[in-house]
Amino acid sequence: MNLEGRKIIVNKSSKELADLLKSPENYKDFMPDGLQKFETREDGFKFGLKGMPEIALKIGEVTESGAVLTSANPSLDFSLTAALQSISDNQTEAQMLFEGKFNPFIKMMVEKPLQNFINSLTDKIEALYK
């Protein structure tokens, strides 16, 4: 299952964004409304939103072209990527991309909430760095 957020322009360089995305604490600022729990770890974070189960993410490779977050739960096979494309010294195009391997029943249950989550993340990032 692949989901995409809309492309946005962020008023930060791709290096500045990559530096932000390396730190688990910074992800709290990107979380949608309804955040009920947020815990950081050395290599990631766990969060809970109202009406959804808690999700633990591990921060993987972070470069000036993107950041890859993967599930910290080995039984869930998915990744969330922030794809970054430098436009100028102080502007970057960003897009959230989700890729997950789920059975058809789970896919049917999670597809809409995940798309809403990706849209909310995109909106928050855009609002923070206009």
Model-predicted regions and their roles:
Residues 7-11, 46-48, 58, 83:
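Generic structural detector for well-ordered beta-strands
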Residues 1-41:
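Hydrophobic ligand-binding cavity/cleft-lining segments
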Residues 126-130:
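Short, highly charged C-terminal tails/helix-capping segments
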